[in-house]
């Protein structure tokens, strides 16, 4: 290729030389026309010029003698003509003038030659680059050839290993044949002995011994398999314990940092106390100077100072309590370290696996008990001070209530609280405030009521959204005496945490559980679905109503309109009724509540709700909070401890009514005798006797019965189907309300929702499937708390991806309005876009968002603006996951028109139809491993509870040993198969059949071997 290019370049250069030589030859002409133009008269004499040039060249090459000889041969006329022509040519004055033109042409040709030389150099460089690429490709080809050769070598090795395995198999067959030969030899010997001595008792005993040895080998094999299985669980438990130790060390550091911050804050509080004391002294002096004789005011001021001192003392006591709990936490950490040391020492001994497993479980139970004792430790009692009032308005009136600090440290993840001292500010009278941390681990409730003060203690914790924050607004006309104010505040302050949402049962213990040892709850509808232990006490229907009563209070502000009065009276979250002295303030309370209620609700007074439910047909997309709870929240709990099997017919019917399945009672009321009837019923019985044709209704009933027979208390069982219809509004899918309401889909069914269930509910869009999947994951992350979703903007300056996950569809539309995309925000209605889909779904990216918003592709600035704010909102980790998803080879852009295709069984799979059905039934919309780790979304590619950063090299080596042990298990299984085949051949022998009737011991062993 390079030689062809060089030949082309040489030809081009030769052509240029010829052109230049021809141009020089034209200098001799004296014409005024361009010799290269088609109209030039020299075009015909160009040949003569070439001949003259050739003549000149030949003459220069000849010698003098040859020139003279040639001159003699030229005719005289020709010579004279040439002389005249040449002399006249030299005497004319045209040559110098025309020479300039030719010189210009020559210069132009020289320039063209230089440009061609440059082009030649460029072409040369390109040729060299192409040569480099060719060499690189040849190198890659060599590498691929080497890889192919390596693959062929591996294939040869695999073939060799296969042949070696076949030879081993042949060896085993040869051994079996040898054993058969030995067996025949033994049989011949037996016949000889029988003929000679007629005594075969010894031989029978040997045969029995052989049988016993074979059975012992089988038992040893089973023991080895059990030990290997226990080794796997032990390694998993060891790794989980390492993770727990790492978490405990991290929490220890956090607690130490918190302790240091609390020390600094205590010092700042002391400084504030000194400043307050100096301020009080100054005010006292001022009062003494201005109002002599008013000793009562001075005494009140002293009382106020004493109360402030008591407040600081309570803070110091709380700090000491936290120090004590930190020490307890350190002791528990030391116990974990000791337990880890014992595990490391005992992990190499094969015979102590089971004991180690038992000891680790016992130690974990002891640690869990120690942590539960920590949580039962009393919190410091609140020190309350009554406010003071100055009737003359000459001094600064102050109302200060002590901060109530309650620290609740869970088993593994104690939260930290950082308190900051605010800047000096003058504040108008503010309502009582209550602060709590999101996860409920550490709660700081502060009741501060000031009119004008120099300093105010604030907390950096997030404000609670509970009803305890909705207090009275003070005004100038609301100033009362000291005694009346303290009497009004007494009921509210005696229960400082009455407005906080309750901790779900089992939350603390669930954090103590081993992530490898937790029992994964799955729905199974097989033959043993309704088996319940006889001594197991189940939860009754009134208990479910009681727990529902607790969550219904803080689910929605408008939900108070649907609650009966007796449930409000028994609820721990209700606001105490105003006293006669504070009747003036009730109007302010209702005004404040009216501002904070949901937009769909029309009233807040329970007496205004004349109709409990919507009467004009099915569930509409705008129903909102008009939907009430299906359960009677005011039931008595007299049969709380009665097992479901002993429930009467009326109780079972009422329970079915609460589950929303009351329509089947007319056809099945005669069939239901007690709770045992439902527990023993099969799928066919439910469909035939109760007439339940709807598959989701049968699934709902079976899940509810399974929950009654389970000892676990979960929050998803407390969410009924009316809550799910409101939840569809929150995630932006109100168009499916009718289908979900007809299917009576509740929180438990959401937890176990499968793809087939969604398809039966007529949800066929891929986007809507992913929306429901990520919404269920958000509910699992938040432990199915009814009010975990964020419907309204709170603090826009501190938006984290964990908070964006909780955004509803309406909140996302509010965010679009805040980023100047208000005209496109209504396009998200009914799209299923919520915070969980935006953050947790890798396939949902900016392009999908822009398509759903109907932003045209040509509006690049708008799309860039949306991408900037979208990436800032979801965080860096979610961006990385979305980029990884886009880089996958099978990535397809998520659109609103994509449909879910139901799986179809091929013709070859009809033999395994039952197995296929079971596998499809386990295909959950949201897999069980998603959202199980509370407080964070599961990391991509890792199992919940595992963190690869905490693994050491020893752990990885042990994992490799576990993989090797699995190979050992397979070898043992193959060896046991050979032993079983050998014993089977021995049993089929006629010798054993003959002696089975003679010897009773032989018959016993035969029966044992047949088992």
Curated annotation (Swiss-Prot):
Residues 470-492, 546-556 have a biased composition (Basic and acidic residues). The modification Phosphoserine is found at residues 37, 40, 434, 466, 540, 579, 601, 636, 794, 999, 1001, 1003. Residues 647-711, 719-782, 804-876 form the SAM domain. Widely expressed. Absent in liver. Pfam families: SAM_1, SAM_2. It is found in: Cytoplasm, Cell cortex. The modification Phosphothreonine is found at residues 39, 1005. The modification N6-acetyllysine is found at residue 322. Keywords: Acetylation, Coiled coil, Cytoplasm, Disease variant, Epilepsy, Intellectual disability, Isopeptide bond, Phosphoprotein, Repeat, Ubl conjugation. GO terms for biological process: cell adhesion; cortical microtubule organization; neuromuscular junction development. The keyword Transmembrane does not apply. Residues 420-439, 463-634 are annotated as: Disordered. InterPro entries: Liprin (IPR029515), Liprin-beta_SAM_rpt_1 (IPR037617), Liprin-beta_SAM_rpt_2 (IPR037618), Liprin-beta_SAM_rpt_3 (IPR037619), SAM (IPR001660), SAM/pointed_sf (IPR013761). It is linked to Neurodevelopmental disorder with seizures, microcephaly, and brain abnormalities: An autosomal recessive disorder characterized by global developmental delay, severe to profound intellectual disability, progressive microcephaly, refractory early-onset epilepsy, white matter abnormalities, and periventricular calcifications. The N-terminal coiled coil regions mediate homodimerization preferentially and heterodimerization type beta/beta. The C-terminal, non-coiled coil regions mediate heterodimerization type beta/alpha and interaction with S100A4. Forms homodimers and heterodimers. Interacts with S100A4 in a Ca(2+)-dependent mode. Part of a cortical microtubule stabilization complex (CMSC) composed of KANK1, PPFIA1, PPFIBP1, ERC1/ELKS, PHLDB2/LL5beta, CLASPs, KIF21A and possibly additional interactors; within CMSCs KANK1 and PHLDB2/LL5beta seem to be the core components for recruiting microtubule-binding proteins KIF21A and CLASPs, whereas PPFIA1, PPFIBP1 and ERC1/ELKS serve as scaffolds for protein clustering. Interacts with KANK1 (via CC1 domain, residues 244-339). This is Liprin-beta-1. It comes from Homo sapiens (Human).
